[in-house]
């Protein structure tokens, strides 16, 4: 966002099963929504969309995929980022069932539903025509799938500041802070960056690019 890129967030579940404090159960949904909004603000994002699915039980159902298709056709992004639909056995905590379901729902939406005018025809009738997503970037997946590393050294403090806002999800904030910074430095080394740099790691998939058979 610092470079002027327009960014939108889609939050699929309400996070109602998250957190660690029993006393917060009644207000956890509102608490997590507020944390998300503030964390997004820190990152320069104001366009948030909540799908209000149940935490821990997300499925890539016809209805959920339809919600994602509708949102994509409204926003028409050049790049879609999503959790990876494949389980990461190197660190299984990356592969929460909701993360896997999110990745699968987004994948089904990106291809073929969002570009198929006959999928969810009610959307086209409502003025949301089909369009082709150029790129899908996955994160949080198996390390061997990662093929693109982005240097974020100048933005690490902003990232960690935003993560810290999700206080209900971090029983040990300082340990989380150190863990994130270490992981980002490891990503940079894996990506061939200079020692001391930090990077995000992605599995980039071209959907409709010069290298793909667009529309086939």
Residue ranges and their predicted role:
Residues 1-76, 203, 215:
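Active-site rim/loop-helix segments in enzyme catalytic domains that contact anionic ligands
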Residues 62-216:
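Metal-dependent de-N-acetylase/amidase catalytic core
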